[in-house]
């Protein structure tokens, strides 16, 4: 069964937007995470963002070739699974080191669907249609960093910082299906 173009655009935009949500959505929680996981040196908690970005960078290099070898769908599922598992570890982290390692893996996991979504657009469309679809996806990618901190702050109003990672887990696994 082939999905419609609007559904495809929405799915690809959500996969790409996960990266921005994973970084910007947790910004309101950073002081709380620092207070709990590294109270003696709260500035080290900023490494939580860096480790995700490093994971994304590493994952970006390998996920494209892996999707050529093993198939697009498998890499999307693998990346989404790693992302969800890592978000769960982040949620339960009791040390900064555990959090940093989990965020590194989460970045690698996020890279899979992000890279494959761009590849799928190029696989399925060309010319002006590809440019049009890519522009819709990039509009969403550009808007999400502005909205993600508000989402994170909204979660922090009602719950502890771990809830931000709990929100990341089911959201991502639903998108993979």
Task: Identify what each model region corresponds to.
Residues 80, 84-87, 102-103, 172-176:
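A generic transmembrane-helix signature of 12-TM secondary carrier transporters
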Residues 102-141:
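Cytoplasmic helix-loop-helix junction between adjacent transmembrane helices
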Residues 58-97:
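Conserved MFS/SLC helix-loop-helix module at the cytosolic interface between two early adjacent transmembrane helices
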Residues 98, 135-177:
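Helix-loop-helix hairpin linking two adjacent transmembrane segments in secondary transporters
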Residues 24, 53-61, 145-146:
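Residue-level signature of mid-helix packing/kink "hotspots" within the transmembrane helices
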Residues 30-57:
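Extracellular/periplasmic helix-loop-helix junction of adjacent transmembrane segments
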Residues 7-39:
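Extracytoplasmic
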């Amino acid at each position: 069964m082939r999905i419609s173009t609007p559904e495809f655009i929405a799915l690809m935009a959500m996969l790409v937007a996960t990266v921005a949500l994973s970084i910007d959505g947790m910004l309101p929680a950073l002081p709380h995470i620092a207070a709990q996981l590294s109270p003696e040196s709260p500035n080290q908690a900023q490494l939580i963002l860096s480790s995700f970005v490093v994971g994304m960078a590493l994952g970006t290099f390998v996920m494209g070739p892996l999707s050529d070898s093993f198939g697009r769908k498998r890499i999307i599922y693998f990346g989404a699974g790693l992302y969800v598992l890592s978000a769960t570890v982040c949620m339960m982290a009791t040390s900064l080191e555990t959090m940093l390692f989990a965020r590194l893996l989460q970045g690698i996991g996020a890279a899979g669907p992000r890279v494959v979504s761009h590849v799928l657009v190029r696989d399925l469309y060309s010319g002006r249609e590809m440019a049009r679809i890519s522009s819709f996806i990039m509009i969403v990618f550009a808007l999400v960093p502005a909205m993600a901190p508000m989402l994170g702050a909204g979660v922090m109003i009602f719950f502890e910082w771990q809830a931000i990672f709990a929100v990341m887990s089911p959201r991502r696994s639903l998108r993979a299906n």
